[in-house]
């Protein structure tokens, strides 16, 4: 009965979309291309709460009719916006500059803050730096020397922040898995680090959870470090990072997988 009802619903209210080709989305692509300048900012010096960055960057939104405007660059927003720029060689300088800004923040603060605002340096955002590095490395066919330097920044972030070597037991808290955190030890601010600000997902107790997404991102980091080691012909690094990734995968499957429900869930440790 349910199956028949579902079939009737889809036949009545749902149409399978046609496959689009380049001509169908030409107008949308042109709009996006012309919109990038509205999102681009240049601020090389610290001004009030805004932290200066060495290169132009993108802000997450712009609306000319709104009195509010963004002037800061956000960590994971930047990664996803750059996905829309990688296919056009004309964007290479801006894309490379945005990634270099993240490296600059790691050099200055030992981490990538939520955004380049002084009141947002108490926490980060979901770690996407290795994905960013490899997207740029592959898109622009960069050399191994560049990759080695870029990966070194990601490793510094990995160890300082997510593995809690700089501030022990703040992020990495249970059986090798990590949580979102804020130096003010406040649940809502830790939730902001998740990028889900704000959400019912953690029941306003974000500090108590080992999140699926965060630990998956860190598994990607460890896998990417292994891949970089292979490219750089560092066999010792390959072995080390393969073991690290396998260890995290085992912990994720052990703690975050719910066999009865057939899915992964955040774990209240």
Language-model-detected regions and their locations in the chain:
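Acidic, mature catalytic/reactive cores of soluble proteins
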Residues: 1-269
